[in-house]
């Protein structure tokens, strides 16, 4: 990539099975789940941590105190999905949206995937199973680079390499979003139990840094809202 890799990009790329022909089994599964909510939360976390948006109280008439997003001065990020979200935050019509509503209505998977295709990191591929039935999927343009990303993830989550702050953020997003099934080792893979232990450990380590440009509590509130969206009682 020619610029900083966002949390959402990394999560989406990790959810794509490896194409390495030497591996008989893909080392990670790609089950249906709550990936879209988690990718949307990743975009929000990125914007809050960079100081582009703030999480502010929004007292509702019926539901008491909730939180929403507020733009902190428009500065393009260079990422199409992030800038699209910034534009939505700036729209006065969205001023009363709660954090949970921001997570539900994002369409993040499509936006992040389309951006990666546009930038030549992923390519559109269609599998034909009959004259009229086709299955669309996005595949890495450079399998070696994709394999390196997956190996880096395994080094941290299976082989206990010292994590970066972004690794801890990935763990926190996966745990809060209940989306770990997108990157979990396939059942029966050695180290699967350790993976879950490591995931919880790194999630607990995640402590967003606070600076004059942003409030670390905003990230915590995004993760808490993500957990509520994915709670069994939420219906999702």
Question: Residue spans of the language-model regions?
Answer:
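Short, amphipathic alpha-helical interface elements at domain boundaries
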Residues: 1-104, 218-236
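Short glycine-centered helix-capping/turn motifs at secondary-structure transition points
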Residues: 51, 120, 178-181
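Short, structured motif recognition centered on aromatic/hydrophobic residues
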Residues: 44-47, 116, 169-175
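Intrinsic, low-complexity N-terminal interaction/targeting segments
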Residues: 6-28, 98-100, 129-161, 165, ...
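Glycine-rich, aromatic-bearing surface loops/beta-hairpins
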Residues: 137-236
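Internal, conserved structured core segments that host functional sites
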Residues: 87-141
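Accessory beta->alpha helical hairpin/"wing" motif in late/C-terminal subdomains of nucleic-acid enzymes
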Residues: 57-83, 123-155
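Short, well-structured alpha-helical interface segments that form or flank functional binding sites
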Residues: 38-42, 107, 111, 168
């Amino acid at each position: 990539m020619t610029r900083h890799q966002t949390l959402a990009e990394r999560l989406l790329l990790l959810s794509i099975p490896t194409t390495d022909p030497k591996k008989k089994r893909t080392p990670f599964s790609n089950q249906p789940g709550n990936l879209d909510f988690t990718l949307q939360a990743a975009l929000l976390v990125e914007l809050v941590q960079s100081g582009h948006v703030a999480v502010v109280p929004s007292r509702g008439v019926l539901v008491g105190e909730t939180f929403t997003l507020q733009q902190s001065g428009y500065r393009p990020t260079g990422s199409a999905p992030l800038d699209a979200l910034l534009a939505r935050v700036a729209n006065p019509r969205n001023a009363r949206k709660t954090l949970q509503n921001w997570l539900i209505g994002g369409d993040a998977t499509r936006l992040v995937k389309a951006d990666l295709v546009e930038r030549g990191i992923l390519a559109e591929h269609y599998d034909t199973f009959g004259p009229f039935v086709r299955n669309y999927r996005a595949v890495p343009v450079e399998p070696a680079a994709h394999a390196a990303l997956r190996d880096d993830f395994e080094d941290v989550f299976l082989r206990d390499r010292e994590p970066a702050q972004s690794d801890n953020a990935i763990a926190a997003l996966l745990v809060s979003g209940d989306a770990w099934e997108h990157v979990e080792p396939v059942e029966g893979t050695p180290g699967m139990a350790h993976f879950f232990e490591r995931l919880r450990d790194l999630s607990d380590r995640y402590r967003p840094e606070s600076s004059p440009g942003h409030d670390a509590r905003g990230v915590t509130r995004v993760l808490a809202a993500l957990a509520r969206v994915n709670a069994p009682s939420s219906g999702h």
